[in-house]
Each structure stands twice: as structure tokens, then as C-alpha cells.
UniProtKB/Swiss-Prot annotation:
Pfam families: Aminotran_3. Belongs to the class-III pyridoxal-phosphate-dependent aminotransferase family. Transmembrane segments: none annotated. Induction: By putrescine and agmatine. Also regulated by the global CbrA/CbrB two-component system. Pathway: Amine and polyamine degradation; putrescine degradation; 4-aminobutanal from putrescine (transaminase route). This is Putrescine--pyruvate aminotransferase.
Length: 456
């Protein structure tokens, strides 16, 4: 893959980016020195940059493009809706056909008893919404003191003020004095990195027990909810030990608090079930959703809400919350078509029965690499821990090993994401076995090149 810029348009676009664009999660000085990578088109599981390089996108954009790139049906759904009703708001007791039909379509695949949806423009907005909603719920029940939400360290729930607070990423907290009051955190179920001498099962129970300790510390009478991703995504694809979620369910059953399962990444097939909560057998009260809802073709998010919660909200008067683009008709039309594709083409069933088992089998083959301390994954998400010493799990003192590996990936025509020194993937659900083979071959090549630089 050519890493030299040969296209004059690339330089022009890079200059425009440098002079006018402030992209998210970016060191601007570093980017301006290097120049942005310009992505120009996509098809299936591949993207192309402005230099003509073909790249296997093993991150599905940003955990989003479940049905793959280039689905003309989604383009046509947006086109039809733009002609008929390009926009109308949902304020002032109005609705439109796409949004009510979409709410029903989501209810049809959601966990049992979750039949209502509040729509937003993103996953971050969805997590803002759950904070507002759970506090309004408890106030309506006559318990307004139940305001505290318990999250997990290294969890990710978006980057709005509420989202970054609910999440537990300390680097994000340091920019802006977060979390906001009323949000506290407990340990994450990260056995490889934090389990010490405990077995995975022992650590899973220990990590879950931290929830009960925090409830008792804060006082059950003050706790509104516990929020967690079924599998932590941006934190490094943290797959909890088998004992973790059963123990969490046991604790939640003892206390009068709500459970928020953040399904922004796991939702719409990523685990081989429609939702990660179904994969783990959990029964949340609220589920933030986004990303795979539209396969990233257009921004949209939402919160799926349990019927018992809605019954209380119905008694609470006006819910003073919403967004201009809540339930945007074009986004709703695209989401409806996206769900139709997932259902009619049985994409999630194929993930569960065929492609996910094959991906995880091939992924585990990378565990023998001298740079890999652990290979883990579920469904269509997976991670590799890059370590200096496999036996002792000793980390590299230079924190840039993951980013070095990521750069090798780009040069070799593969997108993997680096979370510190953990390499993660989340490919489109439509990836086929031959493309999985290509992914693994490229990943091993990139690991070899990284190891040559850091293990010499």
C-alpha cells in the first residue's frame, strides 16, 4: 500500500482540513503536522482513500456499519423520505409514519417487555436522555432523592457532559472537571488487566460485588440506576468473565434501582443476538441505542424503555426533554430499512451460526504471536492485548505500541483501532469467511512488523 501522497486533491483536502476543520478526539497540532487521511468511497467491508488505496474496514466505521457499505436500499429509503417529508419535529403532540413504525419495529426485536422508544440523534444524546429519564422516574414515584447513577471505570457512554460523566474514562474526566455531581463509578470487569492472581470466575464475582458495596456506601435510598455496556467497547472490548453478569443480576434483584444497558455498540446484531442483553440473559429497564440502528448511514439514536417505567412516566406530566432532530423522518426511514435488511437477509442469524464462530476461531490463532498476551472476543467484536512479556503480562513502558501497530495496519490495507496497547476490531456483520481470512492474514503481518520494531 502506497504511503506517499501522489494525488493533488489529497493535499488540497488536507489543507482544507488543517485550515478549517476541528475533528473529534484529535491532537490538532499532531494532525496538522501529519495531514488527515482522506476517505473517499466504500463498498461492502472495504473503504478507499484519496490515494486509491483499498482498505479492509475491520471497525465498521466506528462500530456502526452492520449491513456493510453501499446498500442502495438505504439510499433509496432516504431519497423517498426526503421527497415526501424531509423534516418535521416531534414536539407539540405530533408524530409521523416513519418514527412510529420504527418504534414498533424496534419493540419487535427488543427484549421482552420493552415496547417504547424515545428517539435521539446519537448514542451520546441517548445517554443524556437516560440520566434525565431515570431521575424524572424516581421523582414521579415520590423518591426525588434517588439521583445517583453508578457507572464503571473505563466505561464509555458518549462525550456530552452527561455521557462523559456516566462513562469512567479518566482522561476525558480531566478535561472539564468531570464527572458532574451524582455520578459515581466502580471497577470494570477487566480480568486480563486487573484480575491479579484471581481466576476469571473469582474476579468476575469480585468485580460484580463492587456494585453492592457502592450501593451500600451511597445508600440504596439515593441510588437511581446502574449503567453498563454488556461488553465494554471503547474501553478495549472488555469481555466480562462468565460469573460477572449472573452476580450483577443477583445484586440488582436485591435493591430498588434501575438497570441501564448501554447497547449503542452491542445492539443490532454485534453479539449474534439483536442486543447484548439478550446474549447475556439480562433484563434492563432502559437501553440506549444508536450506531447499528441505521448502520451509520445517517445519525440516529434512542432509548428503549421497559413498560413498567413508561407506566410511571405516564403519571409524571410533561417530560421536559427532547431534541430538534429526535426521530428525524429520514433517519427513521433509513433505520426501518436497515432493520428490514437485517431481518429478511437473516444477517444476525448468520453471524451467530457461521461468521462469528469462524471469526473467533481465526482470531484465537493470533494468541500464539510473541506480541499477543491475550486474544478475546464475542460475536463480531474482538481484541488483542499487546505486551512485552506474555508470561508476566508486562506492559510496554512506551505507550505508543498500539498506535504503531495501527499505523502498520493502515499501511497494509487494514483498519484496526488502538486502545492504548490493545488492538480491537468490530467488522461489518456481513463480512464473509474469505474476508475474515484476509483480515487475519493482514493482522498477523502488522503484528510481525510491530514486533520487529519493539521486541528487538
Amino acid at each position: 500500500m502506497n504511503s506517499q501522497i501522489t494525488n493533488a486533491k489529497t493535499r488540497e483536502w488536507q489543507a482544507l482540513s488543517r485550515d478549517h476543520h476541528l475533528p473529534p478526539f484529535t491532537d490538532y497540532k499532531q494532525l496538522n503536522e501529519k495531514g488527515a487521511r482522506i476517505i473517499t468511497k466504500a463498498e461492502g467491508v472495504y473503504i478507499w482513500d484519496s490515494e486509491g488505496n483499498k482498505i479492509l474496514d475491520a471497525m465498521a466505521g466506528l462500530w456502526c456499519v452492520n449491513v456493510g457499505y453501499g446498500r442502495e436500499e438505504l439510499v433509496q429509503a432516504a431519497t423517498r423520505q426526503m421527497r415526501e417529508l424531509p423534516f418535521y419535529n416531534l414536539f407539540f403532540q405530533t408524530a409521523h409514519p416513519p418514527v412510529v413504525e420504527l418504534a414498533k419495529a424496534i419493540a419487535d426485536v427488543a427484549p421482552e417487555g420493552m415496547n417504547h422508544v424515545f428517539f435521539t440523534g446519537s448514542g451520546s444524546e441517548a445517554n443524556d436522555t437516560v440520566l434525565r429519564m431515570v431521575r424524572h422516574y424516581w421523582a414521579t414515584k415520590g423518591q426525588p432523592q434517588k439521583k445517583v447513577v453508578i457507572g464503571r471505570w473505563n466505561g464509555y457512554h458518549g462525550s456530552t457532559v452527561a455521557g462523559v460523566s456516566l462513562g469512567g474514562m479518566k482522561a476525558l474526566h480531566e478535561q472539564g472537571d468531570f464527572p458532574i455531581p451524582g455520578i459515581v463509578h466502580i471497577a470494570q470487569p477487566y480480568w486480563y488487566g486487573e484480575g491479579g492472581d484471581m481466576s476469571p470466575d473469582e474476579f468476575g464475582v469480585w468485580a460484580a460485588e463492587q456494585l453492592e458495596k457502592k450501593i451500600l456506601e451511597v445508600g440504596e435510598e439515593n441510588v437511581a440506576a446502574f449503567i453498563a455496556e454488556p461488553i465494554q467497547g471503547a474501553g478495549g472490548v472488555i469481555v466480562p468473565p462468565d460469573t460477572y453478569w449472573p452476580k450483577i443480576r443477583e445484586i440488582l434483584a436485591k435493591y430498588d434501582i434501575l438497570f441501564i444497558a448501554d447497547e449503542v455498540i452491542c445492539g443490532f446484531g454485534r453479539t449474534g443476538e439483536w442486543f447484548g442483553s439478550q446474549y447475556y440473559g439480562n433484563a434492563p429497564d432502559l437501553m440506549p441505542i444508536a450506531k447499528g440502528l441505521t448502520s451509520g448511514y445517517i445519525p440516529m439514536g434512542g432509548v428503549v424503555v421497559r413498560d413498567e417505567i413508561v407506566e410511571v412516566l405516564n403519571q409524571g406530566g410533561e417530560f421536559y426533554h427532547g431534541f430538534t432532530y429526535s426521530g428525524h423522518p429520514v433517519a427513521a426511514a433509513v433505520a426501518l430499512e436497515n432493520i428490514r435488511i437485517l431481518r429478511e437477509e437473516k444477517i444476525i442469524e448468520k453471524v451467530k451460526a457461521e461468521t462469528a464462530p469462524y471469526l473467533q476461531k481465526r482470531w484465537q490463532e493470533l494468541a500464539d504471536h510473541p506480541l499477543v498476551g491475550e486474544a478475546r472476543g464475542v460475536g463480531m467484536v474482538a481484541a488483542l492485548e499487546l505486551v512485552k512479556n506474555k508470561k508476566t503480562r508486562e506492559r510496554f513502558t512506551d505507550k505508543g505500541v498500539g498506535m504503531l501497530c495501527r499505523e502498520h495496519c493502515f499501511r497494509n490495507g487494514l483498519i484496526m483501532r488502538a486502545v492504548g496497547d490493545t488492538m480491537i476490531i468490530s467488522p461489518p456483520l456481513v463480512i464473509d469467511p474469505s474476508q475474515i481470512d484476509e483480515l487475519i492474514t493482514l493482522a498477523r503481518k502488522c503484528l510481525d512488523q510491530t514486533a520487529a520494531a519493539v521486541l528487538a
